[in-house]
Amino acid sequence: LIRDFIISNIKEVMTKYGFQYLETPSFEYTDSIGKFLPDKERPDQGVFSFKDENKWLSLRYDLTAPLARYVAKNYLEIPKPFKRYQLGTVWRNEKPGPGRFREFLQFDADYVGTKNLQADAELCVLISEILEKCGLDKTDYTVKVSSRKFTDKLFEQLKIKSKDQISTTLRALDKIDRLGWGEAKKLLGEGRKDKSGDYTKGANLKSDQIKIIENALKSKTPDSEDVLEIIKIFQAYNFKNYKFDPSVIRGLEYYTGPIFEVNLNFEVKNSKGQAIQFGSIGGGGRYDNLVSNFGNLDCPATGISIGLDRLVFALMQKKDFKIKSTRPVIICVFDKDKTKEYVNILNKLRASNISSEIYPGEGKLKKQMGYANKIGLIVKRKNSY
């Protein structure tokens, strides 16, 4: 019910903002999407794959790489800019946890074919509107903004040139919001063993390099032109629910400019009632070079996404969260010979657009009432009509 409520609000907002809906396939060739995964040197890591007639296929890891392939194939036919959104299942071959799933429904919104940073700013604004329509208050979340240009300068300062070391460092920094600086710091060094005993190899940075990163992440003032421009546009929209945060990295290598992350400001607990570091419920950024990987095209783009199942998990944590809904009706069966009368009542209810059903099983009133109670229906009692 909560998921349907969120989807309904997403569709309403996206229609208002003039986005078109686009569906992409669940499977992609592994060698096509592998280059966009967090570890492109090992494209089979993090995805579910199988071999089909000497070709490796993978369940999509996200909705962005499939979109890039679609745009490259249909570049001449689609309008530019192309404003697209999608709701679709994605799969991650990763360790699950509270609010983290191997299969989950994701929402994506993208602007393709424009370098104008108003597109980036508007994506943050529309995400904010969706979250508030779904029941979050302005104080419940923050849209954090940074830029990949910040990390580019940082890597120059660190004198890191190895692509493998750069990607490992990006993945480590991307985990700060979920693991905290102390644990992420281990991933910047030799590596980290989690509570289950699984070991993740680190970036093998030296202590002085890690110190440079730590100091850089304390910056409170943006110095990149793209972030400053986006903040100006936020002001034009009167959008105030944002914060510059250089620790927003995003682990995928295809980001080229501004990056965003949506974080919750209230405590989230696991099934044992323990407070956890939940991480973000969504994020995105500019990926100006991604489409060109599928064709010789200059096609800038930017996008943002929300993990719906993570949002559902978060909304369920709010004590004051309620969905206004009209409960359906069940008509209990007392006499099988009066089926015609029951159907007449059913038809009247459905003609008034009231969700209703005749009890579909067999059993006495107690059993029927138990069924109605378990599925939360209003019960139609004898002689009420």
Question: Across the structure, where does each feature detected by a protein language model lie?
Answer:
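Short N-terminal amphipathic alpha-helices
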Residues: 15-30, 44-46, 59, 78-83
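Phosphate-rich ligand and nucleic-acid binding surfaces
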Residues: 148-149, 153-160
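Short, surface-exposed recognition loops or helix-turn segments adjacent to catalytic cores
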Residues: 138-149, 170, 243-249
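Acidic, His- and aromatic-enriched active-site or binding-groove loops in soluble protein domains
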Residues: 43-54, 158-184, 239, 268
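Short, glycine/charge-rich beta-strand/loop segments that flank catalytic centers
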Residues: 24-32, 82-93, 141-151
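Positively charged, Gly/Ser-enriched RNA/tRNA-binding surfaces
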Residues: 2-17, 28-29, 64-76, 84-137, ...
